[in-house]
Amino acid sequence: MKLLGHKIELWAGLLLPDVSISGMSELRFPEEKPLLRGQDTEMESADTFLSAADTDWKEHDIETPYGMLHVVIRGTPKGNRPAILTYHDVGLNHKLCFNTFFNYEDMQEITKHFVVCHVDAPGQQVGASQFPQGYQYPTMEQLAAMLPSVMQHFGFQSIIGIGVGAGAYVLAKFALIFPELVEGMVLVNIDPNGKGWIDWAASKLSGLTSSLPETVLSHLFSQEELMNNTELVQNYRQQISSCVNQSNLQLFWNMYNSRRDLEMSRPGTVPNAKTLRAPVMLVVGDNAPAEDCVVECNSKLDPTNTTFLKMADSGGLPQVTQPGKLTEAFKYFLQGMGYIASLKDRRQSASAGAVPSASMTRLARSRTASLTSASSVDGARPRPCTQSESSDGIGQINHTMEVSC
């Protein structure tokens, strides 16, 4: 596995320390701990708790240059296949953010082909101890720089990242720093922009007039969802208050609201433009508070390897409210990269002539014109072939494929 062993200079003169295989091999890693039902009593009544069948999930606490990271993993590295690595939004943890999505039956059919690694931001996991007074929470850049330690610990050669909100920002930053370690990114509700003084002042004012859970809810859900006070909103209000340490959450929230611009530019728009190299699928609900931010992020990415998925009738948490549609989109995204070229959809098993929905067919075509065979998964995987590179005469793409479903 190739990891960067040299110093990496980030914005504003920030210098990250050496990150090397030899250095990381000297770190101490506690033994893995099975994730057993009943350990998190406050979560047992929630729909977001891991199902009883998921006894093969295991917890790890991993030492990194910027502190300990709590991760939950299922499976082992499979040949040359990347790991699926997730990063949750602020106010959540891997359970609250991803359980509905990863427990969805069709998603489980996909993930059995990969090792899955959920990363919890420092101090955000269920049952986390409160950080001592004066603790300096890692910056967003440092959160990204912690991930190579996770990859080294488990022997991951590369990852396909799935990030939501703040987690999408962290994974995008990771992909900019370590592009050779990333094969693909699914970025939900990403905001590529930093926070200015006006935003900072507004955030401070909001903190004075609203409780922390309410402030976080306004980040996660649209005003319409909050006004309707749906059962989903009520459930997350209770879970954010009871399952996430409020002091630790405040530190993460403050750091996210101090982030800098990702400083990406679409190739050809400025000299030496820097953007994400790997295939990217941007996802946002058409009623999400982050909709405009995701549209702006789309304008900064390479249109030849970017898919923009806007989910109709979806609010701020599409992975929770519409896991089926997102699973189908993710399946075709993987197929476009040359993975799981043949995967049976349980909903189509009753009819041999069933075909994917029109929107998902368009999504598949936008990612690739020819899929590799399933046997190529463990061998050398060819570079994804977009329509603009294919020889089927479909035509050349000069803009990002946008799909609504």
UniProtKB/Swiss-Prot annotation:
Region of interest (Disordered), residue spans: 352-405
Biased composition (Low complexity): 361-376
Subcellular location(s) of the protein: Cytoplasm, Cytosol
Record GO cellular component, one term: cytosol
Keywords of the record: Cytoplasm
Protein task: Contributes to the maintenance of intracerebral BDNF levels within the normal range. May enhance growth factor-induced ERK1 and ERK2 phosphorylation. May attenuate growth factor-promoted ELK1 phosphorylation in a microtubule-dependent manner.
Name of this protein: Protein NDRG4
Taxonomic lineage: Eukaryota, Metazoa, Chordata, Craniata, Vertebrata
Comp. bias regions, Polar residues: 385-405
